[in-house]
Amino acid sequence: MTTLDTLLRDKVLLLDGGMGTQIFARSPTLEDYGGAALEGCVDLLTERRPQWIREIHESYFKAGADAVETNTFGANPLVLGEFGLSDRAYALNVQAASLAREVARSFDRPRFVIGSVGPGTKLLTLGHVGYAELLASYRVQMDGLLDGGADAILIETCQDLGQIKVAVRAAREAMAAKRRRVPLWVQATVETTGTLLVGSDIAAVLTSVEPLGIDVLGLNCATGPDEMHAHLQTLSEASPFRISCLPNAGLPVNVDGQVVYPLHPAAFAPKVLHAASEFGLAIVGGCCGTTPDHIEALAAGVEKLNPPKRTPKLERSAASLYQSVALRQEPAPLIVGERTNANGSKKFRDLLAAED
């Protein structure tokens, strides 16, 4: 039986592209959402318009994706509570994972379902929400994704180290309660400023999550592939985890009042494939602005890539919210050969006497 882990040992895994991009291409109306009060609640469309979500998953699988993400980016009680739907969180996660699983099973070769867990709308570090409340909210989502059959949990578009730690804990607790272990992936979002939204650099992210025992640490969203290079290099050189990269289709531009992502598939794919080869990426795909055409362009090149081989050197460090500092003494201590002391070692004294 092929599992995600065995597939990752054999090849570079190809994930899907933007879910939101495909949903908004269908121009959802108030009727699609279920009324003006629910406008913008994309997670609810799994229930309201399941055929849309099915078609999107199918289109990415047909394009060559090995796995798709569930339509659950904001499907936790805190986010859904903004629409008065907190009590629907568990059911929506089960439904989304089950729907993706059903589509995956309709294809011949093994395809996988990745449970998408977004950052939410409240930052723990800035005091928008309490630890216990955020943990409880994520736990509901993790329970639903696992019960729906997700093959892995992806905590994505992370902007806050505190949020990452809470989400990882919620996933661990859910897995322990269900006695079911699935891979746990984390993807940070590094802005054009070079840091996460709250100011953390990628080295601080790595130092903070390294003890958590996750399986993948990567990047997604905010920028195109070119802008991710420096951060991917940091991970490539130091991270003990597999690396994922799901960039946007370039930096968005405003064209006649519309947001446009400038990297078309023929330009996007070579950039991502170059990064995969250069930095030893294990998982690639797309985020905002990417479509099945982008994934199809990637698929042709991914098949030619060898499984990544890296020799990372993780330096023990401590991190603040913003930066990581290596636990290194400079200047280093002077090593003294104390046992080469005739007064302290009879054996050494005898060797000296024997002129040995």
Predicted regions and their residues:
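Domain-level signal for soluble alpha/beta catalytic cores
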Residues: M1-D356
